[in-house]
A protein has these predicted regions:
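Solvent-exposed soluble domains appended to multi-pass membrane proteins
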Residues: 1-206
Length: 206
């Protein structure tokens, strides 16, 4: 979440310099989600199916509703010949994703089990850099000639932001809060990681 969409945080340095530098061959904007601070699976459900979680008050569709196949964006892409992979570097059982992704028509689900024990972590969670390196690895091993769709739910910036062993490199001026410093420092690390991913795919023939 970029707090500049709702305010003007004053930080000791820019926390998204690479993304801010992109002005060509890119579409930028904002989106609204049905939840904040948790319940990521609800946002996933809305994005992938186009349905609203308002139909499921107090419920998480992945957990309570997924007992059969669901038409989704993945279905449309599969009909067009895409290889469809879901990735989330956490336990496959969280929010019953292993079941939900299968019912959403994904060919494969890459969970924390497919990441090396030596993969870079921050605050105990897989870093965006390690996550994106896994995307590149997966792409390079995809079915030859097959178009490729990968739905990725990262973990690096998951709350909370009170880990005393994490070294924050950015200070949020005007806030006496280690949590804010950690959050914006993590965003900077995300910006560096997305730079790696975008630069890689800029060199790939479409």
């Amino acid at each position: 979440f970029d707090y500049r969409s709702v305010g003007d945080p004053q930080t000791s340095e820019s926390y998204m310099p690479f993304l801010d530098s992109l002005t060509e061959n890119i579409i930028k904007g904002h989106t609204l989600t049905c939840t904040k601070g948790g319940g990521t699976a609800k946002t996933e459900y809305e994005f992938l199916t186009g349905n609203s979680c308002k139909r499921f008050p107090g419920m998480v569709p992945y957990v309570s509703y997924f007992t059969h196949s669901q038409y989704s964006l993945v279905t449309t892409l599969k009909d067009q010949g895409y290889q469809a992979i879901a990735m989330h570097p956490n336990k496959a059982t969280n929010w019953k994703r292993s079941t939900a992704y299968r019912f959403l028509d994904f060919d494969e689900f890459i969970s924390i089990d497919q990441f090396s024990d030596t993969a870079k972590r921050y605050r105990g969670m897989i870093s965006d850099q390690a996550n994106y390196e896994k995307i590149v690895e997966t792409y390079e091993n995809k079915e030859p000639g097959s178009p490729f769709f990968l739905f990725d739910v990262t973990m690096q910036n998951h709350s909370g932001y009170t880990n005393r062993y994490f070294q924050a490199d950015i200070n949020c001026n005007g806030y006496d809060s280690d949590e804010a410093d950690q959050y914006f420092s993590l965003l900077k690390l995300s910006d560096e990681a997305i730079s790696y991913l975008i630069r890689y795919f800029q060199q790939v023939d479409e």
